[in-house]
Swiss-Prot record:
It comes from Bos taurus (Bovine). Residues 1-26, 308-354, 411-484, 550-619, 728-770 are annotated as: Disordered. A zinc finger (FCS-type) spans 142-180, 216-256. Keywords: Isopeptide bond, Metal-binding, Phosphoprotein, Repeat, Ubl conjugation, Zinc, Zinc-finger. This is Sine oculis-binding protein homolog. GO terms for molecular function: zinc ion binding. The keyword Ribonucleoprotein does not apply. One of its GO terms (cellular component) is nucleus. Pfam families: SOBP, zf-FCS. Belongs to the SOBP family. The lineage of its organism: Eukaryota, Metazoa, Chordata, Craniata, Vertebrata. A motif (SUMO interaction motif 2 (SIM)) lies at residues 651-655. Residues 1-14 have a biased composition (Basic and acidic residues). It comes from the Eukaryota. Residues 460-484, 736-753 have a biased composition (Pro residues).
Length: 872
């Protein structure tokens, strides 16, 4: 064992030679690599670059003088630089030494008594740390002896295994663990002192003595990044600012983060005091209150030196009085501050923001406070502070939530605010963000009313919403937080308080329920946030119909829709789909004409517009009343004058003006058995013509008088046309006479209808093609129309006795697809080429048909095709 001990400790005269035993050399090589890697890893933990042993040796020779004291400190520097390498190297030998009872060697570590070594061996200590372990000088015998020391770190008595020269004193340690802990503590202390700007108080030499490693790094021109606190070489640094504010960042990423942080803070500082008074003071005060600067974005808004001296944040300095509350937490430790900064998110205080300030506030910034009440979970002493409903939320996520909340409050609280503060010039709901913050008028203090709390606390929200004082009488109370958007369904127009822009008002109904899900907004985000507004703009489809059907009492007896059953109304309704709504004047004319017509003819076709108008517009409604049905048989409500008896069984409603209704007039023939040969009177033919060529209805409309007697025949003819095939041909016949006759004129000459008899066959084929087109255009009709037809069909059920009759309700809903499936056929609006010349008004139908396909929907089209096939 003695030999091994000697081998492990080469004599001093052999220090310059490599170890005699190759095994020893291998171990030393391995340990050297291990030491270098371990030290580099340790340095990496503290943000230092890795150090090459040879490079370090050269640097040391260049950087320090060679006097005894400097060498002594150089030795310490090396010890600090590579504490582990020496330990493992000697620990390899230590087993032998310890086994022989020579424990002193293990404790020496070759550097433990570096001061003595430097005295005894001249320049040797300078190179000892950086040369391979074999060259490490073993401690002198007196040094190697079991020296009992009190560990400088754990304060326990033990064998001295490490010593660290701290300039004027030498600290001894009983174990590697204590040595590393002490070194780490000094490193942190010196780094913090340097960051605090106290470096000027400590000369460089002092650092060299106290923490040689730090001096070594400074000499190498390695600086600490002002953002990430990592050490990079100066050539990689980016300078930002000048003078005292000059900062250095290790990468563009750090610089950008710093700029973004400053941008956030400046933006918030410019907001009114009430909005962001507490946004940053808490964070900055916390971070600054701790001895060590907390690495949070908020701490870098200002120069490092100023940030450490300044307690109030720039926002607080702007005149915000909220700072004191947050400052109470300034003494928390760095870890605490990290948590607090997230958990205690300051919220704007509505009471501190007078309405007068709002005009200058960007819309987004103003609204967040509006919906934010004093945080519920915050102690009373610091009302401005708020914890999110979900507990501590990471700052980035919280910011996004804030943005969402900021956009929502205008809609949630906007109406209440407007109701309570109608005189506010900015109360226009169109710009929710511009209006005075709802919170402003309420001036709610820390003891926020339920109005504010509902947004913050789902627990309080449901009970408080019904009694929200600010809600306008028309507004529905916000649904409980659980309900997604129960109140969003289109509110009546009357419920929208501020007429100019009802949409935001509508938003108010549903959005309050969302508020509890999102923490109150407290941050102003400098970038635009596109927030989809869930505004279901409820444009009731019947609205256009309502406007057209406004003629008196012109609602179908079905009552399902607003489409009037009166001829004028039906024409108007038909016009709506087609886009050619009759003017009230026309509808009135139609009603008056119908009134003038004999009672028997009241159900018959009425032309609402004058003949010229009819030709110009295909707005004429042709109603052919079944002759068999009494004038009063109509189940529908006529105009006040009783003009229409729409419900009559035989009435066929053709709205020439609207492609949807005229072209799409699909009448359900109760019985497909219609005799095409039947051509009773000219009036009947005209009626047929009107039905077939819905565009030619004007003449039919003009038939009221004659049509009464011929009503039955006309109905049959029309039914024939509706049924298709031969009936259609006859319809074409009848259609010719009407073309140019004004609606008022009496029955057109029967001869032209006869002429049309010849084209009966082509008319049928044409009818087939037209049916398809008509179906397409009819597909355009709304589900409402179908419903109407169904209702009308039910009404007409009593009159179904006549096989040729179409549903009386079909007047208004000639195009109702549901009714067709039985035997009904689409009346072809497009006349044959031969007929077109005679039927100028009929020509109008073609453009309407062309327009029809735009609106048609595939399902409806399929249905129309099905109906056509059945009719065939």
């Amino acid at each position: 064992m003695a030999e091994m001990e000697k081998e492990g400790r080469p004599p001093e005269n052999k220090r310059s030679r490599k170890p005699a035993h190759p095994v020893k050399r291998e171990i030393n090589e391995e340990m050297k690599n291990f030491a270098e890697n371990t030290m580099n890893e340790l340095l990496g933990w503290y943000g230092y670059d890795k150090v090459e042993l040879k490079d370090g040796e050269d640097i040391e020779f260049r950087s320090y003088p060679t006097d005894g004291e400097s060498r002594q400190h150089i030795s310490v520097l090396k010890e600090n630089s590579l504490p582990k390498p020496k330990l493992p190297e000697d620990s390899v030998i230590s087993p032998y030494n310890i086994s022989t009872g020579y424990s002193g060697l293990a404790t020496g570590n070759g550097l433990s008594d570096s001061p003595a070594g430097s005295k005894d061996h001249g320049n040797v200590p300078i190179i000892v740390p950086l040369i391979p372990p074999p060259f490490i000088k073993p401690p002198a015998e007196d040094d190697v002896s079991n020296v009992q020391i009190m560990c400088a770190w754990c304060q326990k008595v033990g064998i001295k295994r490490y010593s660290l020269s701290m300039g004027s004193e030498v600290k001894s340690f009983c174990s590697e663990k204590c040595f590393a802990a002490c070194r780490r503590a000094y490193f942190k202390r010196n780094k913090a002192r340097d960051e605090d700007g106290h470096a000027e108080n400590f000369p460089q030499q002092h650092y060299a003595k106290e923490t040689p490693r730090l001096a070594f790094k400074n000499n190498c021109e390695l600086l600490v990044c002002d953002w990430c606190k990592h050490i990079r070489h100066t050539k990689e640094y980016l300078d930002f600012g000048d003078g005292e504010r000059r900062l250095q960042f290790c990468s563009a990423k750090c610089l950008n983060q710093y700029k973004m942080d400053i941008f956030y803070k400046e933006t918030q500082a410019n907001l009114p005091a009430g909005l962001c008074s507490t946004l940053h003071p808490p964070m900055e005060n916390k971070t600054e209150g701790t001895g060590v600067q907390l690495l949070t974005p908020d701490s870098w808004n200002i120069p490092l030196t100023d940030a450490r001296r300044k307690a109030p944040s720039p926002v607080a300095a702007a005149g915000q009085s909220q700072g004191p509350g947050p400052s109470a937490s300034t003494t928390v430790s760095p870890s605490d501050t990290a948590n607090c900064s997230v958990t205690k998110i300051p919220t704007p205080v509505p009471k501190s923001m007078p309405i007068s300030e709002t005009p200058n506030i960007p819309p987004v910034s103003v609204q967040p406070p509006a919906s934010i009440g004093p945080p519920l979970g915050v102690p009373p002493r610091s009302p401005p502070m708020v914890m999110t409903n979900r507990g501590p939320v990471p700052l980035p996520i919280f910011m996004e939530q804030q943005i969402m909340q900021q956009l929502r409050p205008p809609f949630i609280r906007g109406p209440p605010h407007h109701a309570s503060n109608p005189n506010s010039p900015l109360s226009n709901p169109m710009l929710p963000g511009i209006g005075p913050p709802p919170g402003g008028p309420r001036n709610l203090g820390p003891t926020s009313s339920p109005m504010h709390r509902p947004l913050l606390s789902p627990h309080i929200h449901p009970p408080s919403t019904p009694t929200m004082p600010g809600n306008p009488p028309g507004l529905l109370p916000p649904p409980p937080p659980g309900a997604p958007l129960p109140s969003l369904p289109f509110p009546p127009v009357s419920m929208m308080p501020n007429g100019p822009m009802p949409v935001p008002q509508m938003m108010n109904f549903g959005l309050p329920s969302l508020a509890p899900l999102v923490p109150p907004p407290t941050l102003l985000v400098p970038y635009p946030v596109i927030v989809p507004l869930p505004v279901p703009i409820p444009i009731p489809i019947p609205v256009p119909h309502v406007s057209d059907s406004k003629p008196p009492n012109g609602f179908s007896s079905n009552g399902e829709n607003f489409i009037p059953s009166a001829p004028g109304d039906s024409s108007a309704a038909g016009g709506k789909p087609g886009g050619h709504s009759l003017s009230p004047r026309d509808s009135k004319q139609g009603s008056s004409k119908s009134a003038d017509s004999p009672p028997g003819c009241s159900g018959q076709a009425l032309s609402l517009a004058p003949a010229p108008a009819e030709h110009g517009r295909s707005e004429v409604v042709d109603l052919t009343r079944r002759a068999g049905s009494p004038p009063g048989a109509g189940g529908q409500l006529g105009f006040p004058g009783g003009v229409l008896q729409g419900p009559q069984d035989g009435v066929i409603d053709l709205t020439v003006g609207h492609r949807a209704r005229l072209h799409n007039v699909i009448h359900r023939a109760l019985h497909a058995h219609v005799k095409a040969e039947r051509e009773p009177g000219a009036a009947e033919r005209r009626t047929c013509g009107g039905c077939r060529d819905g565009h030619c209805s004007p003449p039919a409309a003009g038939d009221p008088g004659p049509g009464a007697p011929a009503g039955p025949e006309a109905a049959a003819a029309c039914n024939v046309i509706v049924n298709g095939t031969r009936g259609a041909a006859e319809g074409a016949k009848g259609a010719e006479p009407p073309p140019e006759q004004p609606p008022p004129p009496p029955p057109p000459p029967p001869a032209p209808p006869k002429k049309l008899l010849s084209p009966e066959e082509p008319a049928v084929s044409e009818l087939e093609s037209v049916k398809e087109n008509n179906c397409a255009s009819n597909c355009h009709l709304d589900g409402e129309a179908a419903k109407k037809l169904m209702g009308e069909e039910a009404l007409a059920g009593g009159d179904k006795s006549d096989p040729n009759l179409n549903n009386p309700a079909d007047e208004d809903h000639a195009y109702a697809l549901r009714m067709l499936p039985k035997t009904g056929c689409v009346i072809q609006p497009v006349p044959k080429p031969a007929e077109k010349a005679a039927m100028a008004p009929c020509i109008i139908s073609s453009p309407m048909l062309s327009a029809g396909p735009e609106d048609l929907e595939p399902p409806l089209k399929r249905r129309c095709l099905r109906i056509r096939n059945q009719n065939k």
